[in-house]
Each structure stands twice: as C-alpha cells, then as structure tokens.
A protein has these predicted regions:
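Non-catalytic terminal/linker segments enriched in charged/polar, low-complexity residues
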Residues: 1-138, 144-150, 168, 172, ...
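P-loop/Walker A NTP-binding module and the surrounding RecA-like catalytic core of P-loop NTPases
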Residues: 129-132, 137-346
Length: 346
C-alpha cells in the first residue's frame, strides 16, 4: 500500500494523454480511496481586461448610481441627508453603519461648512473609507512554510472558485501553492478544485470520500516535503445552523494544528455579496465557531449592492482579505478600503 500523501501509481489505462500546453494528470482522485496528488504545470498568464478599479466600479454600479444620483442638486439640506440614509440602508449597509456614517457626515459638514452636494459627496467617500479602514489588513505569509489557509463558507458562496483564484494571485506573488480538497463528500467539489489546479498548474491533494481532516493533514505534510509556500484547504459548504457540520469544522481546525502546531495560520469565510445582511449573520456564526482571521467577499459583479461591507465593519470587523468582482481568474484582489469607497461614491 502506498503511503498517504504520496503520488499514486497509475497504469496505462488510468493515465491521461498529454495535449499541447496541457499537464499530465498523475492520478485521478476517484480511482483511489487514499489521498493522491494531482500534479499540474502552470499555464501561461492570460491578459486581464480593464483595470481593477474599473471592474470594481462596474460591479458596484447599482449602489454607486443610487448614491451619486443624490448629489445632482444645488444645496445641502435635511432632505439630502434623509435620502442618503435611505440609499445606504437599501444598499445593505444596515442600521448601525448607516447611522454612524450619517452622524459623521453631518458633523463633518458642520465643521467644514460644506454647502454643495459635490462637497458632501467627497465627504461621504472619505467617511466611508474611514469606516472600512479597519477591514483592510496586509496579507503576508512570512514566518510559516507552509502557510496554511483554512477556508469555510456556506454552499454556493463561491468558495472553491475563490480558492482557485486565490492560488493564481499567490502565484503572482512568486509563492508556490498546494490545494487540499477537504470537501470529500461532493465529487463535483473535488473535480472543480482539480480543474482549478490544472488551470493554475498547482498540485491538488484529493480523496474520494473519507475524513476531510485527514486529507488536509496529508496535504500539509506533502507541502512540507515539497517545500511549498502555501496550502489552501477547501472544506465542505455548510449552513451555520447545521451544528454537527460546524463541529466538524472545529475538528478539522484541531487536526490541522496536529500537523503544524502553529496552523492554521489563516481561517477565512467566503461570503456571497448578494446575500446582503445574511452575510453578516454568517460572519458572526463562523467567527464564533472558528475564530475567523479574514473574509472573502465574492460576486460583486453588478447585482450585489456592496453595502454589507459597511455592516461588517460596524458590527463584526473581521478583516476583509479579498473581494471578487467576476468570473475571470484575475477577478479576485486584496481589499482596499479607499478603493472600495471610491468605486461606490465616485
């Protein structure tokens, strides 16, 4: 029997043929009940359409248009503040964040004697950036090798896709990556992660069924043996109300610590921006269970309102590590408070 975490042997029938520019799939996860390594070669980078800020503005256009449309008048009056308050609440900012922003905006307008809607618009951008600033935190993997990122989230939030995009971003920082297919119950999840591994040219540790904690444990040891910089561990999607599944997440975190007593070095929850205030409830639940160190907010691509970021800042300021604005492989970037505020208000 081969050792766990080592590449599986394949016979002629199980090997895939090489095609031009493609990598060889050393072993297919569904052929073995043991953890296997899927090795892929990194393909050439594809050009990214448009600047990141432009894509972010397009993604937040719905809320941005509502907000900027309020500043077309000629005076700053009580009606303008009331309209701003309604627009922020409609954008999923929530009552706490909205009240904080409006109070700060009123105080700033008085102090700086702002008398034009354009001046108030600029002040709103500055106050929004200040509110979101605690969510912005530099992401660095120095000090740990491998640096282990545990990723959780509800079904359909874009977790596996975000992992694939994150791997690409990390490669752009000259870091090597290994993916752990910790969702062992859904074959589609493993196949999706393997596809991202092939697309990025990174190895994937996978297993058909079995204990997800064991797969991630093996992945950490495989990464250490290979000298890999970062391990990203996928986990099965679950609702915070599924208490037994939340307990499983806690177990996975404990097992990761057995592989490396300093790990996981990051524990992230992936959120769908389209879920609005429900995303805030997810943050609270996953944070209470796991002690989150970061968030990934996905699907800011034109239908989401984006105000939930302000709600998170006001009520549960877990750092927002990355945001995603589309389906492209480069459509995931580190969160920048000032940039996000400009995209909403400019």
């Amino acid at each position: 029997m081969k050792r766990s975490g080592q590449p599986a042997r394949t016979n002629g029938a199980s090997k895939r043929r090489r095609s031009t520019g493609d990598s060889l799939l050393e072993s297919r996860a569904h052929l073995s009940p043991f953890p296997v390594v899927l090795n892929f070669r990194k393909p050439p980078d594809a050009p990214s359409p448009g600047s990141w800020l432009d894509r972010l503005k397009r993604g937040l256009k719905k809320t941005g248009s509502q907000l900027t449309g309020l500043f077309g008048g000629t005076k700053v009056d009580e009606q303008l503040f009331e309209d701003l308050e309604s627009a922020l609440i409609s954008a999923d900012a929530g009552l706490d964040a909205t009240r904080t922003l409006i109070e700060r905006l009123r105080a700033r307008a008085r102090k700086e004697r702002i008398e034009t809607p354009q001046g108030l618009k600029e002040a709103l951008g500055a106050e929004l950036a200040a509110l979101l600033a605690p969510l912005e935190r530099p992401f660095a993997v120095a000090g740990h090798k491998p640096f282990v990122i545990m990723v959780a989230g509800v079904n359909g939030a874009g977790k596996t896709t975000s992992i694939g995009k994150l791997a690409k971003w990390l490669q752009g920082q000259n870091l090597s990556v290994l993916l752990a297919a910790g969702d062992t119950f859904r074959a589609a999840a493993r196949e999706q992660l393997a596809a991202w591994g092939e697309r990025n040219g990174v190895a994937v540790i996978a297993q058909d069924g079995g204990d997800p904690a064991a797969v991630i444990f093996d992945a950490i040891h495989a990464a250490r043996a290979r000298g890999v910089d970062v391990v990203i561990a996928d986990t099965a999607g679950r609702l915070p109300t599924q208490l037994h599944l939340m307990e499983e997440l806690k177990k996975i975190k404990r097992v990761i610590a057995k592989a490396d007593r300093t790990a996981p070095h990051a524990v992230w929850a992936v959120l769908d921006a389209n879920t609005g205030q429900n995303a805030l409830a997810q943050v609270k639940a996953f944070d209470d269970a796991l002690g989150l160190t970061g968030l990934v907010l996905t699907k800011l691509d034109g239908t989401a309102k984006g105000g939930v970021v302000a709600a998170i800042a006001a009520q549960r300021p877990v750092p927002l590590a990355f945001i995603g604005v589309g389906e492209g492989i480069d459509d995931l970037r580190p969160f920048a408070a000032g940039e996000f505020a400009r995209a909403l208000v400019d």
